[in-house]
């Protein structure tokens, strides 16, 4: 039995092609994935992300609990609304999930975690929180809409109240604020400016329609995937999972090694991996000739081999790009098995497009 988001009827109205996405009926596209992709890069597009899981953590030990739970350090968060991206690890240093944490106070935080990992995430939160004076509350009374693109903020502003516009004016990236009934955050998964808006379920369809009327194009999971891949952003389950260290997934920047006294789950394994440089690394791959780099393809480098974790045709660049996990010794080029022959690809840092422009 698949679940439906509160915006299901709006997707059907817009002619969406629906697919089963980890138990949720979600739009893969509304007719043209490439047009939806380009709308986000050049103007404004919106995604139904109501399948994401919102969890509020409250209590006198909320900060201590999160300092144990995640690899990044929530003590860095001191300004209300500031957000932090972090992996949540198992004892072997593998990634249970990646998530965003919003800081309200030292006793109140909000987590946004992936839909595909909801059951195991909630079970893990329940298990670890048992040792702390905290409450863990799933907020399934909300929907969520991501509005992304160079004109996303301006178009959103046209349908907010004066008070709401004042509350978000000049808000830096990776912040969120509750204003009226909406929680509006300057986060996203596209490499563009925009907002992620948490809205009470009963208001979600109206907000979606207002955004449509303001000229924001609906975009499906297909465009969401090509946009995040161009931006070099990981997709859980493909680019990392419980068997993959964050050090092998371009996530070293999300690990707070100091203070050394903070004993987060998985720390000892990561410290050893960092010391002996034992993990693979994540790189970007670029194929400027014909062909599409595909997830699961073998990557052959001097002295070893790796694997493409995510690959696609990049509508912005006009050729194929990929994220791959490869040996640390990998140089500037590699070879990929395509149609039973080896094709040479360029090896670059993960990330290909930001704010509509190539960063290669």
Swiss-Prot record:
One annotated GO biological process: glycine decarboxylation via glycine cleavage system
The keyword Transit peptide belongs to this UniProt entry's keyword annotation: no
Secretion signal, residue range per the UniProt entry: none
CC terms in the record's Gene Ontology section: cytosol; glycine cleavage complex
Catalyzed chemical reaction(s): N(6)-[(R)-S(8)-aminomethyldihydrolipoyl]-L-lysyl-[protein] + (6S)-5,6,7,8-tetrahydrofolate = N(6)-[(R)-dihydrolipoyl]-L-lysyl-[protein] + (6R)-5,10-methylene-5,6,7,8-tetrahydrofolate + NH4(+)
Matching Pfam families: GCV_T, GCV_T_C
Keywords recorded for this protein, A-Z: Aminotransferase, Transferase
Disulphide connectivity of cysteines: none
InterPro entries hit by this protein: GCS_T (IPR006223), GCS_T_bac (IPR022903), GCST_C (IPR013977), GCV_T_N (IPR006222), GcvT/YgfZ/DmdA (IPR028896), GcvT/YgfZ_C (IPR029043), TrmE/GcvT_dom1 (IPR027266)
EC number per UniProt: 2.1.2.10
Tagged with keyword Transferase: yes
Single annotated GO MF: aminomethyltransferase activity
PANTHER family xref list: AMINOMETHYLTRANSFERASE, AMINOMETHYLTRANSFERASE, MITOCHONDRIAL
Family listed: Belongs to the GcvT family.
Annotated function: The glycine cleavage system catalyzes the degradation of glycine.
Subunit structure: The glycine cleavage system is composed of four proteins: P, T, L and H.
HAMAP family attached to this UniProt entry: GcvT
Protein name listed in UniProt: Aminomethyltransferase
Source organism per UniProt: Pseudoalteromonas translucida (strain TAC 125)
């Amino acid at each position: 039995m698949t679940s439906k988001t509160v915006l299901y009827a709006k997707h059907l109205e817009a002619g969406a092609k629906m697919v089963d996405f980890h138990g949720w009926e979600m739009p893969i596209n509304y007719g043209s994935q490439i047009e939806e992709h380009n709308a986000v890069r050049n103007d404004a597009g919106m995604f139904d992300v109501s399948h994401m899981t919102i969890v509020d953590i409250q209590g006198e030990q909320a900060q201590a609990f999160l300092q144990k739970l995640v690899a990044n350090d929530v003590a860095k968060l001191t300004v209300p609304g500031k957000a932090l991206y972090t992996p949540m690890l198992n004892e072997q240093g593998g990634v249970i999930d990646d998530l965003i944490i919003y800081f309200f106070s030292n006793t109140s935080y909000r987590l946004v975690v992936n839909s595909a990992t909801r059951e195991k995430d909630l079970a893990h939160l329940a298990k670890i929180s048992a040792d702390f004076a905290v409450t863990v509350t799933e907020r399934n009374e909300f929907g969520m809409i991501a509005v992304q693109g160079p004109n996303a903020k301006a178009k959103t502003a046209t349908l907010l109240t004066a008070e709401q516009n004042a509350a978000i004016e000049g808000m830096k990236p990776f912040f969120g604020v509750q204003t009226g009934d909406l929680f509006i955050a300057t986060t996203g998964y596209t490499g563009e400016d925009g907002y992620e808006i948490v809205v009470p379920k009963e208001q979600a369809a109206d907000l979606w329609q207002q955004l449509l009327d303001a000229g924001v194009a609906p975009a499906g999971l297909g465009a969401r995937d090509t946009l995040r891949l161009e931006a070099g952003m990981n997709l859980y389950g493909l680019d990392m999972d419980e068997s993959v260290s964050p050090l092998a997934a371009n996530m070293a920047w999300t690990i707070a090694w100091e203070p050394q006294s903070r004993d987060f789950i998985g720390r000892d394994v990561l410290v050893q991996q960092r010391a002996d440089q034992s993990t693979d690394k994540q790189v970007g791959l670029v194929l400027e000739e014909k062909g599409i780099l595909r997830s699961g393809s073998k990557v052959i480098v001097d002295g070893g081999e790796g694997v493409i974790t995510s690959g696609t045709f990049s509508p912005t660049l006009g050729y194929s790009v990929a994220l791959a996990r490869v040996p640390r010794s990998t140089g500037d080029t590699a070879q990929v098995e395509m149609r039973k022959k080896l094709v040479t690809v360029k090896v670059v840092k993960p990330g290909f497009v930001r704010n509509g422009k190539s960063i290669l």
